Amino acid sequence: MTKIMHIADLHFGREDERLVEALAEKEQELRPDVVVASGDLTTFGRRREFAAARELFDRFDAPVVASPGNHDVPYANMFSRLVSPWRRFRRRMGDTITGSYADDDVAIESLETSRGAQWRLDWSLGKARPDQAREIAGRLESNSPQGQLKVVVCHHPLVAPGGMTGRAKTRFGEEAADIFIRGGAHLVLTGHMHQVFALSERHGDHVCWFVSASTAFSIRTRDEPAGFNLLTAEEDHFVMDIYVANEEGGFKQYERRHLTRKEAEIVPEHPGEPGI
């Protein structure tokens, strides 16, 4: 039974300090096997913002698998943004994070969907590389023993509730999603939208869930409060516990969903009063 703590869009530099502390406490309390961070650890890609992210992750007992987001490129240094957009991310985070992880029960790989620059006006939107997606799917398929959970983490959504429009307009996102579905991935964990959702796609008898988390603790909330997801893998389903920020500066479980691994459906369960 694997437990994954899924966080996204931390946006250090625009963080609620009370929620930073609360998240560290929740990691200790919930004791996940691994923490997955779906990008945007920082707001402007500044060194002090990366230092704050590293300080938080150093407090976690669980290993952290992270993929960079569009806010993790140097905002003010155009040369670095164009030539080496992720050098600061990798150098400043160091061995605090990893791009892949595997144990007897789960294998996790990261897909880079953020770009330092693009041939379109909105550089914040995502772009997946189908060739990288095929490489990742191949590694997961060839290196994963029977029964091992296969997980992909990236920043931008590959599928979205309203379709691939607006902020969800990830180039080649649907192609990458199809590659992962056919390659046997069980979970694709994303961020960027500051929105919680779980959508399923299937290939034959195989079901893949695309799960998005809200912003973990940024003051840059949109239509939903800050929060995170805890995903627990059971034999025939995933238990998705959604935590949201409350007025006291902590996190409270808001909803539990059962994501079936044999049929593409969600069975909701409300454990108590909302924490918002």
Feature map (PLM): residue ranges:
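Beta-strand-turn-beta hairpins that frame and shape the catalytic cleft
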Residues: 1-5, 100-110, 141, 145-149, ...
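N-terminal active-site segment of His-dependent metallophosphoesterases
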Residues: 1-59, 75-76
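Active-site neighborhood of phospho(di)ester-bond hydrolases with catalytic His/Asp-centered motifs
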Residues: 6-8, 35-40, 64-70, 112, ...
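Active-site environment of divalent metal-dependent phosphoester hydrolases
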Residues: 13-15, 43-48, 70-78, 115-121, ...
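Charged helix-capping and loop-helix junction motifs
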Residues: 20-21, 49-53, 129-130, 166-175
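Extended active-site neighborhood of metal-dependent phosphoesterases/phosphodiesterases
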Residues: 51-135, 179-181, 206, 230
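Conserved beta-sheet core of the metallophosphoesterase superfamily
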Residues: 162-236
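A short C-terminal boundary segment appended to hydrolase-like catalytic domains
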Residues: 233-276
